[in-house]
Amino acid sequence: MKRIATYKNGNTYTTLYEDGTKEHFTMDDDFKFDFAESCDVQISQCCDNGCEWCYYGCSPTGQHGKLTGWKFFETMHPYTEIAINLQCPMPEDILPFLWKMHRQKVIVNVTVNQNHFMRGDVREFLGEAIAEDLIKGVGISLTNPKQDDFINIVKQYPNTVIHVIAGVTSPEDIDYLKGHDLKLLILGYKKLERGKKYYDHSSTIVEDNIKWLESDLDEIINGFKVVSFDNLAIEQLHLKDRLDEKEWEMFYGGDDGTVTFFIDLVKGVFAKSSLSPITYPIGDKTIDEMFKIIKDANKKGSD
């Protein structure tokens, strides 16, 4: 496996590999990071897909966040990873932004809905951006695994991960994806915006699907090349109960706000996570100033 970089962050040595794998090493009992290893960056609320459970309330008339003029982008450390939502219609300044991040050695991963991914113009854009090393990883939010030649098309793109939501994705969808050497990311269900409305009238469906995921997890893991989870899914699926202390230490990537945090370019705020009720204005802050605010709030027990 090709190594991209190794760097020191606080008391931790981080190594990045070509396939997206990240390793942390420290001689101390706990990892302590001076700067954020990664950020989840919401760049747009404009999307024509209309998912019933969208936690961000995206719509065709939603606004794009500006991608220029932010001091925190200018001050990001090399090899910081950012995950951005790439929706249709795309922001007009997305390509200059990707080139800017590339020059700063910031690693950009994108999430795109399957309906958009299957469009020829979107796949062409992604293919060219990946070839130029402007985008490292692609997360595809699943809508219908049986669509056209979806699975074979996905496998043409390196470092691609299928994103599914606990409570939304059905057993039939997962079964159809099994056995194709795919990577799967399971996200927790967020009861925000349309996600709350959907849960209010479909809570039985959501909870039954979460229970099914939890009970069939071993079989699901065996059906994919890699299965990973965000922190909310880890909580909803009670993953800590399945692991002993040593396994948990190796598996768990860290609490929200200790190694990563959330940035919303549409609203111009940042927070510990996208679920956090407490937000802070970005203003003219550097990335390290933002991360320090999040870490200090964690120490005080805020949020």
List where the protein language model places each region:
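Flexible mid-to-C-terminal extensions adjoining Fe-S/redox cofactors in radical SAM and related proteins
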Residues: M1-F25, F262-D303
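N-terminal [4Fe-4S]-dependent radical SAM core
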Residues: M1-Q42, C47, C58, W248, ...
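Short, flexible, glycine/charge-rich loop motifs used to bind or transfer phosphoryl groups or to couple energy/partner
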Residues: D29-F31, K71-E74, G127-A129, F251
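Sterically constrained small-residue positions within well-ordered secondary structures
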Residues: K32-D34, T75, M101, A131, ...
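Core AdoMet radical
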Residues: S38, C46, Y56-L67, P78-E92, ...
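C-type cytochrome heme c attachment motif
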Residues: N49-W53
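Generic structural signal for well-ordered alpha-helices
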Residues: W70-F73, I94-W99, R123-G127, D148-I151, ...
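Radical SAM enzyme [4Fe-4S]-AdoMet core and its adjacent flexible, acidic
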Residues: D133-D288
